[in-house]
Amino acid sequence: MNNPKMPMFKFLILGLSFTSSLCMAQQALVDQAIKAMGGLSKLESIHTLQYKASMKQWEPEQSFEAGGEMKFASNSNFEVKRNFDEGLVQVDWVKNFVYPTTRTYTFSEVVRPNAGYIAGIESNTRVKQNKESDPPGHTMSSVRLAVAHREFARSSALLLIEMKRHPLRVQACADVLIDGVSYSALKYVLNDQRNDQVFTVIFDSTTKLPLRVRTLDYDNIHGDVTYDLVFREWGQWGGVILPSKMSYEFDGRLISDVDVKDYQLNPALSEANFSIPAKLLSSAAKPAVGMINFQWPIRRQIIGTLIDSDNNAFDMQAVSDLALTPLAPGVDHQSRGSANSLIVEMKDHLVVFDAPTTDWQSKRTIELIQTKYVGKPIKYLILTHHHMDHAGGFRAYAAIGATLVVGSSNVAHFKKMLNAPYTLNPDLQGGSLARTKIIEVKDVFKDSDGSREVSAWLLENTHAKGMLFGYVSDVQIGFVTDLWAPGRDQIKGKLNATQSQLAKAVEKAGLKPLLFAGGHGQTAPYSQISEAQ
């Protein structure tokens, strides 16, 4: 007698068998890698770890030419202490920066499960708490802490042990092609409660060791990108195989090169190594959840300019919001942020100079503009140059139909960026931006309504190829980014190189500005420049 339930029963058995085989294959990759690193017992015996290392770093979006040679940023030496049982990390840093200026910062970084702390000065742009503390120090923002948690999990010597302990968070993954070679890989979800932080762990088919740990991130210029920790060389310490040379790759480009000098397994580490001042700990931020722009805090640390705030645009301890500051009728300076825009009203539309930091800042600036200039569309977004801190919010303007105006040689770059997917953007979700119009400025761009003329002039300079500066003729107001920070940069005696370049460009254009507003800083009389020549 036929049993109608038997085919379904057989199907379920086959399904369970397939799932079991798949799980076994996943676990085999993890087990092989653990064995290659010295074996399960050796790795599980590691409770604390200490090592010294040196690092070189480059920043791709501060290049002279868009998409060109990366700017060398810093040489660093650091020492890491980790308590794996408690989830504690301390890093003592000496960072020697050469960009954007030459300086050295010596500081310590403490990361705990529910708080982070910086002891000392790590950035040009110090937050309010750091400035007011004696000695200088501040607790990490929730975004910074979440980034630190992810990155220390990525580089953990015990990542494979965590994968073995949490098999339900290990997922099958298609092989990954790197330089024409196919490698086995697994996905690993970092947290049971969240599914937005996932590593792709890629394995070397010959050594069985991990080859890369990859994440998919959002970059404010490039859109969706890969970010890889690459294990280049390994060594043996106390019977355990650990990485001796590592690098970090941003969308396939090397931006950090790390050389580990020594590992100490299970050193005695004091709780004091991981302490946070009690008066600050009680109000310290917990790690952020949800979609996070990981690349911004990672990359701003590379050049030592991170504002350690949950808002990339400004220090939330010191500033509550962006604002429009009137400079003249129909001319506003979007200020209070780390980087600024200039807004100019025409008869039937608006012109905006620069889209700093992220699409959040652009969206907030657009809200302020639409509240003040009701019903007037933003027709042009004029980008002074391609650097991420002044162009990173360009997608929000493209999404509302603005035409991009860029300097000579930058059109291909921005066309490519407008075609790039941006599905991981925490501030903007939408469709294709590929049809956005772009105007190239080879000498000067002018927009006139019969009463007012706005212009953008190409400027020969040493900071960025295709640099533009802006001018509003009827009120004699200029706009400049990076070459001079009006109201911030004190001019004493002779002009520096970039200030001289601005002065020459203004003279060549035959302009007579009275005031300049800055992409950094505030405003200042142009006489500060003209009288110092």
Regions found by a protein language model. Give the residues of each.
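Bacterial N-terminal signal peptides
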Residues: 10-21
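Flexible, processing/modification-adjacent segments and terminal tails
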Residues: 28, 35, 101-198, 207, ...
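N-terminal mature ectodomain segment of secretory-pathway/periplasmic proteins
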Residues: 32-35, 40-127, 174
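Gly/Pro-enriched, hydrophobic low-complexity segments
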Residues: 175-278, 471-473, 480-481, 486-487, ...
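Zn-dependent metallo-beta-lactamase
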Residues: 263-347, 444-445
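Conserved beta-strand hairpin/beta-sheet module of binuclear metal-dependent hydrolase folds
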Residues: 324-371, 467-486
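Active-site metal-binding motif and surrounding structural segment of the metallo-beta-lactamase
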Residues: 360-405, 508-514
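Divalent-metal (often Zn2+) His-rich catalytic cores of metallo-beta-lactamase-fold enzymes
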Residues: 502-533
